C-alpha cells in the first residue's frame, strides 16, 4: 500500500460494479414501468 497516489484496483472494481448494477437496475425498472404503463 505504498502507492497512495493511485486509486486501488479493488476500489475501482467496486465502484465500477456498483455503477453497472445501478445502471442495469434503473434500465430494467424503466423498461418494466414503461411496459406496464403502455399495457
Swiss-Prot record:
Keywords: Chloroplast, Membrane, Photosynthesis, Photosystem II, Plastid, Reaction center, Thylakoid, Transmembrane, Transmembrane helix. The chain crosses the membrane at residues 7-27. Its main location: plastid. InterPro entries: PSII_PsbJ, PSII_PsbJ_sf. The keyword Plastid applies. It is a single-pass membrane protein. One of its GO terms (cellular component) is chloroplast thylakoid membrane. It is found in: Plastid, Chloroplast thylakoid membrane. The keyword Phosphoprotein does not apply. GO terms for biological process: photosynthesis. PSII is composed of 1 copy each of membrane proteins PsbA, PsbB, PsbC, PsbD, PsbE, PsbF, PsbH, PsbI, PsbJ, PsbK, PsbL, PsbM, PsbT, PsbX, PsbY, PsbZ, Psb30/Ycf12, at least 3 peripheral proteins of the oxygen-evolving complex and a large number of cofactors. It forms dimeric complexes. Belongs to the PsbJ family. One of the components of the core complex of photosystem II (PSII). PSII is a light-driven water:plastoquinone oxidoreductase that uses light energy to abstract electrons from H(2)O, generating O(2) and a proton gradient subsequently used for ATP formation. It consists of a core antenna complex that captures photons, and an electron transfer chain that converts photonic excitation into a charge separation. This is Photosystem II reaction center protein J. It comes from Trieres chinensis.
Amino acid at each position: 500500500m505504498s502507492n497512495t497516489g493511485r486509486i486501488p484496483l479493488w476500489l475501482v472494481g467496486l465502484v465500477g460494479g456498483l455503477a453497472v448494477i445501478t445502471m442495469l437496475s434503473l434500465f430494467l425498472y424503466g423498461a418494466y414501468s414503461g411496459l406496464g404503463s403502455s399495457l
